[in-house]
Every structure is written in C-alpha cells, then in structure tokens.
Design a protein with these regions (language model features):
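A short, charged/proline- and glycine-enriched loop
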Residues: 2-7
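Structural motif
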Residues: 9-15, 37-38, 58-61, 93-96, ...
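Two-component/phosphorelay signaling modules centered on CheY-like receiver
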Residues: 9-40
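Short, aromatic/basic amphipathic alpha-helical patches
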Residues: 19-26, 77, 102-111
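Output/docking surface of receiver
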Residues: 33-38, 94-142
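Conserved phosphotransfer microenvironments
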Residues: 39-43, 53-85, 94-104
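Two-component signal transduction core modules
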Residues: 55, 90, 116-117
C-alpha cells in the first residue's frame, strides 16, 4: 500500500471531488486523496503537505461559474504545486464540448505546465496510464 502513488484530486465541487476520489479508490493502483477546497492556496498547500505524486484537477468552462476553473487557472495551480513538489505529475480532466480549448491544452503540455489532459468522462484506461507513468517516475527517483 505504501508503495502506491498518492493521487490528489480536486474538482469544481466537493461532491465531484469525492466521487472522483472514490472512483480512483475502486480503480486501485493509488492512494487517493480528496482536496475538497477548490481554493488555489488550499490545493497547493494540501498537495505539498500530503506529498502528492499525482494531482488531477477538474477543469470547468461553464460561464455561469462564480470563478471559472479554466485551463489558465489550473495551469497556475500546476506551476505552483511543481515549485514545491517538482516530482508531482499534474493532469487536467476537462469537460467535453469545447473543441476550441484543444490548442490551449496542447500548448500547456508542450510548455511542460501539465503532464497531460483528458476531455470528457475520464476513462479507467486513461487513469491507469497516468498512474503507471507516475509509478514509473517514482521508481526512477528512488
């Protein structure tokens, strides 16, 4: 159990975050951690305090949201988390239906701000790939 990577999860609502953490728990291959506060500083602090190996951030493009959790905002979180935990891999789970966002996502990966992204309902296959990449990186460090 201790050898499994710690996967921190933060989506736009606590309920979505809990569901994602429970889903990862059922999927296996990691020790999931729900970050229930979507506040920038809270995400950064908790990722560092919990020694997260992987951070999965939900991205919302909804116009009605009080504070849209867009790609730029999430990349800002990723950069700050990486300053404190350079070994933490950061992935974005984006809502579907916004093909115009693809260039920004590609650029974020190209610039090394994030390690990857998924659009739509995150699949078990994709989550396992990310966990495997994280585990491989952890082994190379130790």
């Amino acid at each position: 159990e201790r050898s499994l990577p710690k996967a921190a999860v933060c989506f736009t609502t606590p309920a979505m975050t809990r569901r994602a953490a429970e889903w990862l728990s059922r999927l296996g291959g990691c020790r999931p951690l729900a970050i229930l506060s979507d506040d920038f500083d809270d995400i950064v602090w908790q990722s560092e305090a919990e020694n997260a190996d992987l951070l999965l951030l939900g991205v919302s493009f909804s116009e009605g949201a009080e504070e849209p959790r867009d790609i730029t905002a999430r990349c800002d979180v990723a950069v700050e988390v990486r300053k404190r935990r350079p070994e933490c891999r950061v992935y974005l789970a984006c809502e579907a239906g916004h093909p115009e966002r693809l260039p920004a996502l590609e650029k974020a990966v190209e610039l090394g701000l994030i390690d990857g992204y998924f659009i739509g309902e995150l699949t078990a296959r994709q989550a396992r790939l990310w966990l495997a990449e994280t585990q491989r990186q952890r082994r190379m460090r130790s």
